[in-house]
């Protein structure tokens, strides 16, 4: 997705290219469905994704574990009532927000507020809906988007609440227009992995790239 191609892969590719300048790397931006199809056809060697792909078809290597976070516009008055649940940005960067010292916010308190969701076919969108369901409410969805960063940018503008992964939050500049909250553990943790087609030739370049990244 353009999330990874914009915020994660450029630095990984740059570091690898500086060590192996003779290896040519092409970066393709597509959604998960299209990338998976390209991988299965052998058009691309590797993809990086937060969706779990079929282990009977694809091999994988863990890049990082990611946690979803609730992002709420700072302008929403409910924030003044929930200061003890708010996550400082430095904790997000250090990934300490899953510690017991950071309380889980009672998500149902946001049930009457507007949400910016990713579509249900997106892993983030599916997980967000399950988290709300487990908190016994149906979110008031005013917009369905395709990309995390688009939803987050709309959240920054003050329009609605969104769910976003901590990997991207650790890479983008801190924004004072957003307040962050820890979510219930169930459904909010996922593995971001590199995938390649099982049984396909696994080149030395692919091996070195994965060793460099993971």
Short names for language-model regions:
Residues 1-20, 24-37, 203-204:
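N-terminal winged-helix
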Residues 51-52, 74-75, 165-168, 192:
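Short secondary-structure boundary segments
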Residues 36-37, 61, 108, 152-153, ...:
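Alpha-helical segments flanking ligand/cofactor-binding loops in enzyme cores
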Residues 8, 166-168, 177-214:
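A late-sequence structural motif
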Residues 11-15, 33-89, 159, 179-181:
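Short beta-strand-centered segments that line the small-molecule binding cleft or hinge
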Residues 20-26, 138-142, 191-193:
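Residues at or immediately flanking beta-strands
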Residues 31, 35, 40-43, 50, ...:
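Hydrophobic hinge/microswitch elements
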């Amino acid at each position: 997705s353009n999330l990874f191609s914009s915020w994660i892969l450029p630095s990984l590719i740059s570091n690898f290219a500086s060590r192996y300048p003779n290896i040519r790397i092409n970066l393709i931006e597509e959604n998960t469905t299209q990338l998976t199809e390209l991988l299965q056809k052998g058009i691309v060697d590797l993809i990086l994704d937060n969706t779990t792909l079929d282990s009977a078809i694809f091999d994988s290597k863990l890049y990082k574990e990611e946690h979803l976070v609730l992002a709420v516009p700072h302008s929403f008055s409910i924030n003044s009532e929930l200061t003890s649940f708010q996550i400082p940005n430095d904790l997000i960067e250090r990934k300490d927000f899953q510690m017991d010292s950071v309380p889980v916010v009672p998500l149902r308190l946001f049930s009457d507020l507007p949400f910016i969701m990713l579509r249900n076919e997106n892993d983030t969108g599916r997980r967000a809906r399950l988290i709300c369901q487990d908190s016994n409410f149906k979110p008031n969805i005013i917009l369905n988007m395709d990309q995390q960063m688009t939803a987050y940018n709309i959240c920054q503008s003050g329009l609605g609440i969104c769910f976003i992964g901590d990997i991207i939050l650790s890479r983008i500049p801190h924004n004072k227009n957003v307040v962050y909250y820890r979510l219930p553990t169930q459904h909010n943790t996922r593995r971001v992995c590199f995938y390649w087609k099982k049984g396909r030739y696994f080149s030395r370049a692919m091996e070195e790239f994965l060793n460099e990244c993971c």
